[in-house]
Amino acid sequence: MHNASDIQSALVPMVIEQTAKGERSYDIYSRLLKERIIFLVGQVEEHMANLIVAQLLFLESESPDKDIFLYINSPGGSVTAGMAIYDTMQFIKPNVSTVCIGQAASMGAFLLAGGEKGKRHCLPNSRVMIHQPLGGFQGQASDIAIHAKEILGIKNKLNQMLAEHTGQPLEVVERDTDRDNFMSATQAVEYGLVDSVMTKRG
């Protein structure tokens, strides 16, 4: 019986490269990593965040002065996992250019906006969605109160950071993240989440 990750890894294409020493085969993501391209695809969770952080740190050690390109197609996910990626993006020396392909929702949208100013992009038919962090804790009343306070603190922090990255006033961000707020690529540019819609490579 094969699990989902076995099936997924079997579906990852391999590319063959000619070198002076003969042929070398890579999975497609490793080959793109050589071009300083990282894919952030699917739910943002701890394991995925660790892999993204490791790739960012590796590319920094390879060339601290060359840009890194982070392609995002994500419905969002864990705030703490997302923050691990975000903090690393801000911490490393290379500029991180972000590109939304498909969708960047919730924490995906936050990471999209967290790219280097002037180097954040959407492809024309991608969608972006911002909202407040989701709660869902169950337990004793006192524990629920503790978690509610924590979520409120996270919400305020994320709104402040989003205001900084977009140039929108804090009260506008607070209003706009109160419910699921979907945007087209053009609307995401107008809002300040990204800097341009890319239709063709320049």
Curated annotation (Swiss-Prot):
The active site is at S106, H131. One of its GO terms (cellular component) is endopeptidase Clp complex. One of its GO terms (biological process) is protein quality control for misfolded or incompletely synthesized proteins. It catalyses: Hydrolysis of proteins to small peptides in the presence of ATP and magnesium. alpha-casein is the usual test substrate. In the absence of ATP, only oligopeptides shorter than five residues are hydrolyzed (such as succinyl-Leu-Tyr-|-NHMec, and Leu-Tyr-Leu-|-Tyr-Trp, in which cleavage of the -Tyr-|-Leu- and -Tyr-|-Trp bonds also occurs). GO terms for molecular function: ATP-dependent peptidase activity; ATPase binding; serine-type endopeptidase activity. It is found in: Cytoplasm. Keywords: Cytoplasm, Hydrolase, Protease, Serine protease. Its EC number is 3.4.21.92. Fourteen ClpP subunits assemble into 2 heptameric rings which stack back to back to give a disk-like structure with a central cavity, resembling the structure of eukaryotic proteasomes. PANTHER family: ATP-DEPENDENT CLP PROTEASE PROTEOLYTIC SUBUNIT (PTHR10381:SF70). Cleaves peptides in various proteins in a process that requires ATP hydrolysis. Has a chymotrypsin-like activity. Plays a major role in the degradation of misfolded proteins. Belongs to the peptidase S14 family. This is ATP-dependent Clp protease proteolytic subunit. It comes from Shewanella baltica (strain OS155 / ATCC BAA-1091).
